Each structure stands twice: as structure tokens, then as C-alpha cells.
């Protein structure tokens, strides 16, 4: 399931135009000048220096290129992708797991019922962050099985830029929380790099998550950007799913405090529904006995719910 949420839009005042036709706010050449771009070429070509350079400082005029900002009305986006979760799991799509916040979002927005993916983690994720067929971006297999053949090398080239890179170049704050199954196994080094195929190398300015298909929820293989971290040390009861949510909230709070008008793109990818299944005790207690009717009865209930919601075709059978 993939969910996008618009939080706010950025408003800017357009007051000037540079030679390329880009719109500029503020005094052109000053350090606080900003500009929008058309996005047809990324990164955009550097503007021509507009100052004056003479033999002495007093006869020279400094000039800064305008900082790129998104266009007026650019939305903030939260994209949530859960792992190994069937279409009929959340209540939003007829499941028996209560998902009141997702229900609220779906009621206020759009609910897609024809969203197809591959049957593997890495290929699906490569497609969603690039908007391209997974073979065309190197992910015919999962990252751990990377092979030295076109379509299977687990390398997303720069000419197939990820959405993090595209939005960053257009002035967004970009971040990735949770599972990263789009870094090939041969780039798992934690000190020497290379890091081109890590989230930070694909345009995501901040990364807090783990590499590979799965990780322990209590002692995860966890990174902040490209540095391994161990937040569970000295914190009994630590849980990655909770920590990840807290870190995302902190990130957005800090971003809003420092740049309240800057739109963000947050790629939020929890791994808690993938093995190893390690929910906190409070969730085990909450759902104890809820599925004692068995799979067949549960399937019939979900099927009826989905037909009632209209998220599956109403057949005569």
C-alpha cells in the first residue's frame, strides 16, 4: 500500500526574471535571491556570473546564483509504503485491522484499487522511487542477488534519477525513513563507501533506516545517513517501528522550525510487517483472540467487506 498526503503548499512572490526565463524573488545577485526552474534539465545549468571582477575588491561586485525553490503551490508529500502487507489487511480496504487515520485520509482523498507491483521487494521499490520499469533501473532481482548483467546489477543510474534527486533539485527537503532495499549488497560497507546507491546518494538529504530486506526490530542494522547507529544501547524495550516514527516527527518539527515555507518529500517505509515479526507486547495483547475464527472465516469476512466498500469488482459468483 502506498499513501501520499499533502500537508501544505508553498507561496512565493515572483518579482524578477533571469536571462534563462526563470522567475526570481529578491534582488538578483544577492545571497537571499531565489528562483524556480522548469525542471526539464536536472541539475539545471549554472547561471552566468552576473557580478563584476576588477583588480581591487572595492571596484568589484559580488554576485550569488539564486537559490532554487519549488514553484508556487508545490505540495508537501508523505509517501508511506508498507512491507509484505496484503491488499485486504488494513480496514481502509476491507481488512479487520483498524486503521482510522488511513480511513480518514482515504475519505478525504482518493483510494486507488488498480495499483500493481512485482512480487519482490527491491524491484517494486525501484519502480516506485524512479517511476520506471524495474528492469530498466537494474532491479530484475533483489539487491542481495545483484548480478553483473543489464537489468540485474541493482544500480540506479543518474539518468534514471530517483524521485528524491528530482525533488531535491527542485528545492524540496527530501528524506527517507525505514527500509532501504535499493542499495546493492556490494555497497553495504559502513565506512569506505561508495555511497552512490544509498538513499543519500539518490537525492534523499536525510536517511534514517536499515539496509536489506529485513532487520531485527529490537537491535536493528540501523543507519543515520551513512553512519551506523545503535540507539537501543541503554534503552531497554527499544523498538525500531516506534523509534522510526519518533525520528520522522522530530525531523519534520525541526524542518518546520527552520524553514516553515519549504515543502518536503518524506518516503516512509516501515519494515515491521515483514519478518521477523516482533510487535511490542501492547499490540500482541490488543489483538489477542481476534483471529481465532481461522483463515477461511476471516477471508470470507474480508471479501464481503471489500465488496461492500467497492474496492473489488462485484461479481455474480
Q: What does each model-found stretch correspond to?
A:
Residues 35-317:
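Formylglycine-dependent sulfatase
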Residues 1-5:
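Positively charged n-region of N-terminal signal peptides that target proteins for export
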Residues 18-22:
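Boundary at the C-terminal end of the N-terminal hydrophobic targeting segment
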Residues 6-16:
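Bacterial N-terminal signal peptides
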Residues 25-31, 50:
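N-terminal module-boundary/linker segments of secreted carbohydrate-active enzymes
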